[in-house]
Each structure stands twice: as C-alpha cells, then as structure tokens.
C-alpha cells in the first residue's frame, strides 16, 4: 500500500517543482526586481502587483502580514500552465535601488513600472502580451496602467472600486474602537482629498502612522484616482475577483468597478477574505489568517483567474 501512496504524493508534488528565477528590468535610478515562475509550457503570463505600503512580492509586509498569498497565487497558477512575475515595487525590498526615496512615488510611477513589467513578461514567456493581476492597491495600479499592446487585460483582485479616501473613511468608521479618533481622521482625509498636507503631530499614534507626513504626498496623489473611471477607460478583458469575507475591500468596491466596466467578468467568492484565504466567519480567524503562511489560498480564486487568462473570450 505504501508504494501507490508515495506515487500519488509524488504526482501531486511535481507541479510545485518549478523554481522562482530572479529577473530585473531597468528602473528610474536602479533595477526593478521580481521573481519569474514559469511552467513547462506557459499558456499565459501574468504580472502580480502587490498592495499598499511595504508589501513585498509574496504579499507579506513587516507590519505583521505573513499570508504569503501572492506567492501561493503564483504557485497555483503555475500548476495550471500560467507563468507569473511577482514584483517588488520601486524603492522597496529587492527594488530598493530603483529610487532613493520609496515614498517619492505616484500611482502613475507604479503604473509605468507595471507596463514595463508586462512587456518584459510577454517577451520572456514568448507570448504577445501579459496580464496585470493587481491585489488591493495593486488593482488601482493595474487600472492606471491602462491600455497597451503588451497588456492583455486586467485582473482586479480585492481591488479598490471607490476613491482611496472613501475606502479608508469606511474602514475607520466600521471599527467602533476608532470612535475617539474619527474626528481627527476625517480632518486628515478631508485635507488630503483637497490636495493639502496636514500636521498630525497631535494625533493618536495610530493616525500618525496612517497619515505619516512622509507618505502624505503619495496619498494626495492616490486620492485623486477614481477606480470606476479608470475601469471605464479599459478596452481589453477585465476580471474582478472579490472575497465576500473581505474586511478591507468590500462588495461595494466590486460593484463600483463593475459599474465602470459592465463587460468585466465578476467572481464573488464566499467565505474568502482580503488575503484570499477561506475563513470561518469570525473576525478573529479572519485577522489570524493574515499571519498564517501555510493556510492555502482559496482554490476558487486560482481556478477563476487561470481560466480567465487562458480563455478570456469564452
């Protein structure tokens, strides 16, 4: 009985033997780096764009997120014949040398990098174009990258559908514990939305971190972006993926994106949260999943994206 079991395990493990290969493209001042994962015969290739702040190519960040969700997504896609490049954003991690100040960026800067990565990915895979798969804020970047010959289309995963400031306002209001700091938070949001920086030195420490003066110029730029309008300008295929247990980005965002791009394919995934993992419905388990790298990514997400990028016109 042991031999068949071993053979079965070997068969299941075989697709995971594909190894990451470090790749790079020119950046503004130094190289931009990423990890290329290529199956034996790639039917499509995607560029996976991470979310906000210091989030790395795998979906982790030093603020306590160790979900490894973007690496798991890449591995799952590889098993279905989809190659991927997971990127580190300019100024961060392996792309730290690309710019001197990681905070001196705009959404347009990130979008330009995404277009460059798409061209590189397509060439590496021997395909005419690459898909942009943006997670969370990465979806906004994918939207801003717009239309280009080497971009097949966009896959927007747990992506903002409302203006950035509106989403932050809703997130803060949703937590009753934030009630004592809401007035200051709203004052900061209003100032940034008006294109003005604000002194937060007298604010609660959590708000000082959220509205750190170093990132306020980036937030001002990000607040100007309207995801729905950007979606409406897209000419290629679009997929919207939204977990129904997401505590950060909600179905209201997915609906807004769908409103901008009625032709988009919408995948709503029950019981799946922001880091694309199944949770039991309790806030505790939802938040705990952010720091459990071994919890699998939702199969529905992998299957849906793989099916879409390999057959977008079905």
What does each model-identified segment do?
Residues 41, 46-77:
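Short, surface-exposed "cap/lid" segments of acyl-processing enzymes
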Residues 18-45:
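N-terminal cap/lid segment of alpha/beta-hydrolase-fold proteins
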Residues 234, 240-242:
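Short beta-strand/loop motif that positions the catalytic acidic residue
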Residues 272-276, 281-314:
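Catalytic active-site module of serine/aspartate enzymes centered on a nucleophile-bearing elbow/loop
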Residues 68-96:
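Conserved alpha/beta-hydrolase
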Residues 69, 102-124:
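Alpha/beta-hydrolase active-site loop
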Residues 155-228:
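Accessory cap/linker subdomain of secreted extracellular hydrolases
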Residues 119-175:
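Primarily recognizes the serine-hydrolase "nucleophile elbow" in alpha/beta-hydrolase
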């Amino acid at each position: 009985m042991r031999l068949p079991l071993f053979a079965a395990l070997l068969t299941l493990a075989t697709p995971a033997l594909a190894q990451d290969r470090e790749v790079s493209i020119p950046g503004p001042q130094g190289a931009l780096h990423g990890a290329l994962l290529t199956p034996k015969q790639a039917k499509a290739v995607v560029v996976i764009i991470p979310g906000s702040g210091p989030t790395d190519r795998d979906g982790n960040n030093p603020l306590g997120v160790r979900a490894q969700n973007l690496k798991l997504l890449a591995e799952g896609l590889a098993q279905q014949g989809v190659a991927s490049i997971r990127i580190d954003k300019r100024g961060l991690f392996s792309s730290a040398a690309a710019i001197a100040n990681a905070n001196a960026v705009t959404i347009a800067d990130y979008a330009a990098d995404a277009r460059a990565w798409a061209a590189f990915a397509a060439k590496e895979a021997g395909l005419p174009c690459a898909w942009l798969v943006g997670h969370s804020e990465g979806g906004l970047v994918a939207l801003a990258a717009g239309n280009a010959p080497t971009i097949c289309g966009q896959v927007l995963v747990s992506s903002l559908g409302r203006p950035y400031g509106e989403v932050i306002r809703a997130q803060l209001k949703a937590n009753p514990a934030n009630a004592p700091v809401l007035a200051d938070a709203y004052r900061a949001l209003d100032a940034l939305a008006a294109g003005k920086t604000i002194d937060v030195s007298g604010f609660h420490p959590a708000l000082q971190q959220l509205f750190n003066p170093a990132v306020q110029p980036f937030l001002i730029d990000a607040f100007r972006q309207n995801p729905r309008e950007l979606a409406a300008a897209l000419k290629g295929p679009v997929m919207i993926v939204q977990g129904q247990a997401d505590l950060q980005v909600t179905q209201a965002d997915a609906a807004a994106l769908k409103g901008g791009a009625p032709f988009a394919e919408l995948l709503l995934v029950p019981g799946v949260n922001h880091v694309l993992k199944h949770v039991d419905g309790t806030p505790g388990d939802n938040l705990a999943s952010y720091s459990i790298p071994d919890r699998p990514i939702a199969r529905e997400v992998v299957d849906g994206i793989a099916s879409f990028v390999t057959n977008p016109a079905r």
